[in-house]
Amino acid sequence: MAATPISATGIPSMGRLPTVADLMPRLRRHGIELPAGVVRVGAFGDSAQLSEELLALIRAGRKRGGASLVWGHEADAEPIPSVGEIEIVVNHLNEPSLVTRTTAVEVVPFNRVSAQFAAREGEGDGTLEYWRREHWAYFSRECQRIGRVPSETMLVVCASFEVLNLVPEPLAPLSVNTLDTEAS
């Protein structure tokens, strides 16, 4: 789900996410073409660490849902996802990481998010208790960013998705020590 763009330092960036046009050449280099339909760009998390953790859960097949605040969408003039939308998900460096299709969207008060959705999000132990604790902390930071006060009844966008494409992760650069070992 879209979140505040984050800089390479892990500090929330006030800059914009890249555009679909910016990302398409990179996707095409990996042989990825997008299906017809509405395409947008989004990110998960509000720090480099959280972004990487959530993307790893998606890549592992554990995470198939994301939650965001209606207030955040309003503050950022960002539409609420709709079923069938394609999303290019970027990492904390604004590099494309994966492509998803939204399969379900429900807007509910924070205190009405279901255990089934919490499990679909795939974070922590998958329980509603874990979801509420961690998302309360996350949404509290989001509320601070947009000048709102968190509430048990704040509206949450619960979106489910399927992964269409995983963008290959770049290989780590070889170190001098690695080259010396390989030459032996």
Where are these regions (language model features)?
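Mixed-charge, low-complexity intrinsically disordered regions
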Residues: 2-99, 106-184
